[in-house]
Amino acid sequence: MKIGVMNNPAKSVYEETIAFGKAGYDFVDLTIEGPQARDVDTAKMEPILKRYNLALTGHTDPCLPWAYPVPGIRQACLDELERCARIFSALGAGIMNIHPCYFCPPAMRALLVELNIEALKPIVEMASSYGLTIALENFKPPFDRVSTFKTLLKKVAGLSLHLDFGHANMGQNNHAIFCKQLGTAITHVHFSDNRATADHHMPLGVGNIDWKNAVATLKATGYDGTITLEVFCDDSQMRFQYLDLSRKYLLELWQ
């Protein structure tokens, strides 16, 4: 099991990565989004990763309307995702996250899952050409339940599941149901706490997620991959203290 942290896109991606390396994390969950992380100079980033022996996973902008049913919009989003894929691949990533697309005309709302399936196929194919596996993240309805993901995984060959435990705490199906029914499809994980009313991104143990059960259920699937501590705080010093407490708690529970 590897524990990593996501960069804050409002700060320098290079300074963030150096800070993660100095703090002893295993990998960077590199999100490519504005305002400060819209582009990444791989020639500048690669030696930083090597210096601190950091691996990397890819995280994409959650606001891209990649399944919107207008060909030009889909193509523009595919081009942007391919730009991200080139960066992730060059930096040694094997996983590339994508968020469900909720953008569609109101009269087509009932077709939202089908629109996502249709648009995911070329995205997964593109990512595969760069040696990347696309991991779709669970989030708001209807992408908050196992039944939707079973359909997606069946109809989109090569797709995998990015299980966000904080999101699952707010959704129709919690982490236990996802792990028990789709455990073998999980390729990446996000851990953060909340009180089920919003995506608070709290340190582990602060909200109402049962972390003993969460870790035990995840381990029972045989998962031993990357876990991102997605804990947010405006104060950088406090953020790393919260992250360190969360890491220690996770390591204790994982034993």
Range-by-range predicted roles:
Residues M1-K2, P9-G21, F143-H162, A168-Q255:
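Histidine-acidic metal/acid-base catalytic patches
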Residues M1-S89, R247-Q255:
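N-terminal pre-domain/capping segments
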Residues I3-N7, V28-L30, L56-T60, M96-I98, ...:
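Hydrophobic faces of well-ordered beta-strands that scaffold small-molecule active sites
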Residues G4-M6, E33-G34, G72-I73, L111-L112, ...:
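A generic structural signal for short
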Residues T17-A23, D39-G58, R83-G92, E125-S129, ...:
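Acidic (Asp/Glu)-rich catalytic clusters
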Residues I32-Q36, C63-P65, Y102-F103, F139-P141, ...:
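Short histidine/acidic/glycine/proline-rich micro-motifs that form metal-
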Residues R51, A67-S160, M170, F240-Q241:
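Active-site acidic/histidine proton-transfer and metal-coordination neighborhood
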Residues P62-W66, Y102-P105, D193-D199:
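Conserved radical SAM core fold
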